[in-house]
Curated annotation (Swiss-Prot):
Necessary cofactors: Mg(2+)
BP terms from Gene Ontology: carbohydrate metabolic process; peptidoglycan biosynthetic process; UDP-N-acetylglucosamine biosynthetic process
Protein name in the entry: Phosphoglucosamine mutase
Function, as annotated: Catalyzes the conversion of glucosamine-6-phosphate to glucosamine-1-phosphate.
EC number assigned by the record: 5.4.2.10
CDD domains the UniProt entry points to: GlmM
Taxonomic source organism: Anaeromyxobacter dehalogenans (strain 2CP-C)
EC main group: isomerase
PANTHER family: PHOSPHOGLUCOMUTASE (ALPHA-D-GLUCOSE-1,6-BISPHOSPHATE-DEPENDENT) (PTHR42946:SF1), PHOSPHOHEXOSE MUTASE (PTHR42946)
């Protein structure tokens, strides 16, 4: 069924413009509260947010919707997305709500939901919420009850703040770092993107012994992700060189992903992190089924890095939720995305930038090697990416010229490369990715496929 509100990471848009309005947030809160109600006990939902100006408006609206259904609210305030997932699970709440647009600019905002076990809400429940909100639940069992449910008196939900949410999450993060190791003597640059991790991230690394150089830790509601953080790691990389640091981390606005820089200021992306951590886990026989889960966007260099140690890569659709779904379904323990979403399922339930940084630092300390040396195991294949604007999105099978160009490119590359043609989830564009050992050849093949796309549907 086509989604009308939810994308791959919740509901998102420009704040105060449909669907990211206070009215919609209230209705989403009512629908979420309705589907988690079961049994006579008092139900509770955790709400957290990043540092956007519009977060206050949406927080109050969604809390009002939840309370109007007789469900209590626990407000965390600014806290990373993985922190809200952790608090939801650890406090045995019935669901969690994150108000954030992740790496987007401050004008945008979003709402995403977590189940009581700390994982993102399954597709079927998101679709049920959509139907309740957009169709007033006309086709759902219990729709009449949803429309009529208006608790009164003491049955109305209450909202209260969790004053120690940051402390709870910080304490949990420190348990991820091995007790026999220490960060004493290491200098770490931490770019918090003026986002949700501005309190917790610097504190965690400092309490584990590192000298911390904090960057972008003064949110004003408008500066989140502004020329900083995981999407713009350049200033973090420069700070690493300037301070002679051992490692730099750039988190995004909700701190569910991270991009690193080595001691020379060279940027280390999610693929390289998966390669070096995957090799460490393989060497210690700690990687479930000797497999790393990545998406179709990850570089072929990842397979090449893991193969000498007997490691494999399983690929999913783009989106960290699909990585996690595959990990849970098949019993894998580690995976992520090139963009820096990294999931250590033995510890966390979703992408966690701080947890990823701690795991990389553990490898550095355990091996006694700098990040530049560890990351050398990953040699990315040249990639050519072309974004083609199209008037409509149609299956490749319906476009003979495009299908022929793809087949020819795949034949030319053989086992030494790959071709990926996929529509954008948010724009009228089709993305053409060609990967191979020769950059010029990859570009020529990508341009050829793009030309066929423009001729067919451009």
């Amino acid at each position: 069924m086509a989604r009308r509100l939810f994308g791959t990471d919740g509901v998102r848009g420009v704040a105060n413009v449909h669907p990211m309005t206070a009215e919609m947030a209230l209705q989403l809160g009512r629908a979420l509260a309705y589907i988690v109600r079961s049994g006579p006990h008092r139900h509770r939902i955790v709400i957290g947010k990043d540092t956007r100006l519009s977060g206050y408006m949406l927080e109050q609206a969604i809390a009002s919707g939840i309370c109007s259904m007789g469900v209590d609210v626990m407000l965390c305030g600014p806290l990373p997305t993985p922190g809200i997932a952790f608090v939801t699970h650890s406090m045995r709440a019935d669901a969690g709500v994150v108000i954030s647009a992740s790496h987007n600019p401050y004008q945008d905002n979003g709402i995403k939901f977590f189940s009581r076990d700390g994982f993102k809400l399954p597709d079927e429940l998101e679709l049920q919420i959509e139907r309740l909100v957009l169709d007033a639940g006309e086709d759902d069992a219990g729709a009449e009850e949803f429309r009529a449910l208006r608790p009164t008196a003491t049955r109305i939900g209450k909202a209260k703040r969790i004053d120690d949410a940051i402390g709870r999450y910080a304490q949990f993060l420190k348990t991820i770092f091995p007790k026999e190791l220490t960060l004493d003597g290491l200098t770490v640059v931490v770019d918090c993107a003026h986002g949700a991790a501005y309190h917790v991230a610097p504190a965690v690394f400092e309490e584990l012994g590192a000298k911390v150089i904090p960057l972008n830790v003064k949110p004003d509601g408008k500066n989140i992700n502004d020329a900083c953080g995981a999407v713009h790691p350049e200033s973090m990389a420069r700070a690493v060189k300037r301070h002679g640091a051992n490692l730099g981390l750039a988190l995004d606005g909700d701190a569910d992903r991270v991009i690193l820089a080595d001691e020379h200021g060279n940027v280390v992306d999610g693929d390289a992190i998966m390669a070096l951590v995957g090799r460490d886990l393989l060497a210690r026989k700690a990687l479930a089924k000797r497999t790393v889960v990545a998406t179709v966007m990850s570089n072929l260099g990842l397979e090449r890095a893991l193969a000498p140690l007997g490691g494999k890569v399983v690929r999913t659709a783009v989106g960290d939720r699909y990585v996690v779904e595959e990990m849970r379904r098949s019993g894998y323990s580690f995976g992520g995305e090139q963009s820096g979403h990294l999931v250590f399922l033995d510890h966390v339930t979703t992408g966690d930038g701080v947890a990823a940084g701690l795991n990389v630092l553990a490898v550095m300390v355990r091996e006694g090697k700098p990040l530049s040396e560890l990351a050398r195991c990953f040699e990315p294949f040249p990639q050519a990416l072309v974004n083609v604007e199209v008037r409509e999105k149609r299956p490749v099978a319906e476009l003979p010229g495009v299908a022929k160009a793809i087949a020819a490119a795949e034949k030319a590359l053989g086992a030494e490369g790959r071709v990926l043609v996929r529509p954008s989830g948010t724009e009228n564009k089709v993305r053409v990715l060609v990967e191979g050992p020769d950059a010029k050849r990859a570009r020529a093949l990508a341009d050829g496929i793009a030309a066929e796309l423009r001729q067919a549907i451009g």
